[in-house]
């Protein structure tokens, strides 16, 4: 991937990176452990982003 990226592309990459994590601990406490994992979790090797 090129070092120089357009701003919109960079923002989309940052957004994808932020959304690719487990829910915080306080969410589990608040929902009485009904929400324990993120169903939209993405692995960089298996699933590619449709950004191009």
Swiss-Prot record:
User: GO CC terms on record?
Assistant: cytosolic large ribosomal subunit
Keyword Ribosomal protein (UniProt): yes
Which keywords does UniProt give here? Ribonucleoprotein, Ribosomal protein
**GO MF annotations in UniProt:** structural constituent of ribosome
What's a BP term from Gene Ontology annotated to this protein? translation
Q: Does the keyword ATP-binding apply?
A: no
Query: Known NCBIfam families for this protein?
Result: PRK01242.1 (NF002316)
Protein family per UniProt: Belongs to the eukaryotic ribosomal protein eL39 family.
Which PANTHER family does the record cross-reference, listed alphabetically? Answer: LARGE RIBOSOMAL SUBUNIT PROTEIN EL39 (PTHR19970:SF0), RIBOSOMAL PROTEIN L39E (PTHR19970)
Q: What is this protein called?
A: Large ribosomal subunit protein eL39
Recorded source organism is Caldivirga maquilingensis (strain ATCC 700844 / DSM 13496 / JCM 10307 / IC-167)
User: Encoded by which gene?
Assistant: rpl39e
